[in-house]
């Protein structure tokens, strides 16, 4: 596994990686590297105004992006009770976070994943990852490493060859502060 992690560390410095999530493969990069984020948006043919999701091994990895102090004490349990799990939350964004991640909004989409391969990857790298489905905009998302290779070829710098979590649909996306549902898991 040490060779695998070494390859992941090398690829994430400036490149795009692919890894399994709860339902599909995700394409990701280091959210702190704007060049890599732009490269990812271009590869996916995804408009920047849509924003991106960040996944993490634990909530502390999301604190550089989430304005934690803007989450009212009475809502904190609701926020944290969703994780780890297959629920992406829309939370207040910290000042200075790239608009490439937020789509220009004052919120950011984040998830503490319970899917162990993705969680282990975030733990090993020591930070959150951008997570967007591994597909060109308008096409079906890849569910295997082979499908990622088929859609993207050499454009992806490293692929974690593990299984997805087996969920039929992508994660639910909600704002727990106002109970707005952006994407249901049904």
UniProtKB/Swiss-Prot annotation:
It is an enzyme of class 2 (transferase). It catalyses: L-threonine + hydrogencarbonate + ATP = L-threonylcarbamoyladenylate + diphosphate + H2O. GO terms for cellular component: cytoplasm. Pfam families: Sua5_yciO_yrdC (PF01300). Its main location: cytoplasm. InterPro entries: DHBP_synth_RibB-like_a/b_dom, Sua5-like_dom, TC-AMP_synthase, TC-AMP_synthase_SUA5. It is found in: Cytoplasm. Signal peptide: none annotated. NCBIfam families: L-threonylcarbamoyladenylate synthase (TIGR00057). This is Threonylcarbamoyl-AMP synthase. It comes from Idiomarina loihiensis (strain ATCC BAA-735 / DSM 15497 / L2-TR). The lineage of its organism: Bacteria, Pseudomonadati, Pseudomonadota, Gammaproteobacteria, Alteromonadales.
């Amino acid at each position: 596994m040490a060779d695998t992690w070494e390859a992941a560390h090398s690829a994430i410095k400036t490149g795009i990686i692919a890894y399994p999530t709860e339902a599909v493969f995700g394409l990701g990069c280091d959210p702190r590297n704007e060049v890599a984020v732009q490269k990812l948006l271009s590869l996916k043919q995804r408009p920047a105004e849509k924003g991106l999701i960040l996944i993490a091994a634990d909530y502390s990895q999301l604190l550089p992006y989430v304005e934690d102090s803007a989450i009212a004490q009475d809502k904190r349990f609701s926020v944290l009770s969703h994780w780890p799990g297959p629920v992406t939350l829309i939370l207040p964004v910290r000042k200075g976070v790239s608009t490439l991640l937020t789509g220009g909004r004052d919120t950011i989409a984040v998830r503490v994943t319970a899917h162990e391969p993705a969680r282990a990857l975030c733990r090993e790298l020591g930070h959150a990852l951008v997570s967007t489905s591994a597909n060109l905009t308008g096409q079906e998302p890849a569910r295997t490493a082979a499908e990622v290779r088929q859609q993207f070829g050499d454009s992806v710098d490293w692929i974690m060859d593990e299984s997805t979590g087996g969920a039929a649909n992508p994660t639910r996306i909600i704002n727990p502060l106002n109970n707005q549902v952006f994407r249901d898991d049904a």
